[in-house]
Regions:
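C-terminal helix-to-coil terminal segments
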Residues: 92-105, 119, 264-320
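Rossmann-like adenosine-cofactor binding region
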Residues: 172-271
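NAD(P)-binding Rossmann-fold cofactor-contacting core
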Residues: 160-177
Length: 320
């Protein structure tokens, strides 16, 4: 029973080598970086499991004996957005390594804005020595949108750093020591308290374009940072790039950090590139590590074949 690594834009080699280390008895197949399988088409009949990142729909259609589709990304919209889905379970990979990487990114960006990173970079360029007032972490409220595994862990990390953390999610969630809000009724209350808004939302019909001019205008305006800050490490489709660019340019947002965008790679002509109060990273907040995640997948496959239930199954209707 073969495993196929079907990825577009990534080199499959590191995944293949790690899977072969962990499961030498299994046949491991791979696509090219273009997502196309160039091997013997007859070999696809052996494929029972696919590890996917932006898989080609025509390739999935050729897998007559597929049993499980594993997403190699933190999100699953790259699969759920396909015009036709195979009628098999889709599983997300939830792993401590991936979770830790996301929390590191969130903490890095929160601290950059909290400790006035842009101002210090400017002062250094000007060769000017000036002590800036530094608010305590406890004076700053971090609002986290999306309270799944990644959001919960990021919230706990920020609490340990001393920040006041609140959360918002589609449905009601309870997290010890963190005030949470949910649904449309809770959104405005949540936004009105947030000095730094961190989005770790999945991309669903309900979240598409949610971070727009209207939402940004409802963020807290009189906080210790001089205005609100936006951090998005969730999905690019949840934001309106043009609205964020305009808000950064006119001061509605005093700063932002974006790891995701509506169009990726971010086009050279995007106005976001020229903004000096924006940190841009190329969708690397939580890059999947073959060494860590392949073990998780092999363990899941082994358990599944022994009759156990798969973990972290995706509900296509909900989008995550």
């Amino acid at each position: 029973m073969a495993i196929l690594v079907a990825v577009t834009g990534w080199e499959a080699g590191p995944w293949v080598r790690r899977l072969q280390e962990l499961a030498p008895q299994r046949r491991i197949l791979e696509t090219g970086i273009d997502g196309i399988f160039a091997g013997n088409r007859g070999d696809l009949e052996e494929v029972r499991y696919v590890l996917a990142w932006m898989p080609r729909v025509e390739l999935l259609a050729d897998l007559a004996n597929l049993r499980v589709l594993f997403s190699l990304g933190a999100g699953v919209d790259h699969i759920l957005g396909l015009p036709v889905l195979p009628e098999v379970p889709i599983a997300r990979i939830v792993d401590p390594d991936l979770t830790a990487r996301m929390s590191e990114y969130v903490a890095w960006q929160v601290l950059h804005h909290h400790r006035q990173g842009f101002a210090h970079i400017r002062l250094q360029a000007e060769r000017h020595w000036e002590e800036l007032r530094q608010p305590a972490a406890g004076e700053v409220t971090i609002g986290i949108m999306g309270l799944g595994v990644l959001g919960r862990d990021a919230a706990e990390v920020l609490v340990r750093l001393g920040f006041h953390v609140i959360g918002w999610s589609r449905s009601e969630k309870a997290i010890d020591g963190i005030v949470t809000y949910h649904g449309k009724p809770g959104l405005d209350v949540f936004l009105g308290q947030s000095d730094i808004l961190v989005s770790l939302l999945p991309l669903t019909p309900a979240t598409a374009g949610l971070i727009n001019r209207s939402l940004i205008s409802r963020l807290k305006r009189d906080g210790p940072l001089g205005g609100p800050v936006l951090i998005n490490a969730g999905r690019g489709g949840s934001q309106v790039d043009a609205d964020i660019a305009a808000a950064l340019a006119d001061g509605t947002l005093v700063g932002a950090s974006l790891d995701v965008f509506e169009d990726e790679p971010l086009p050279p002509g995007s106005p976001l590139w020229g903004l000096t109060n924006l940190v841009i990273t190329p969708h690397v907040a939580a890059v999947s590590s073959p060494r860590a995640l392949a073990r998780n997948i092999i363990d899941q496959i082994t358990a599944f074949e022994s009759g156990q239930s798969l973990q972290h199954l995706v509900d296509p209707a909900r989008g995550y």
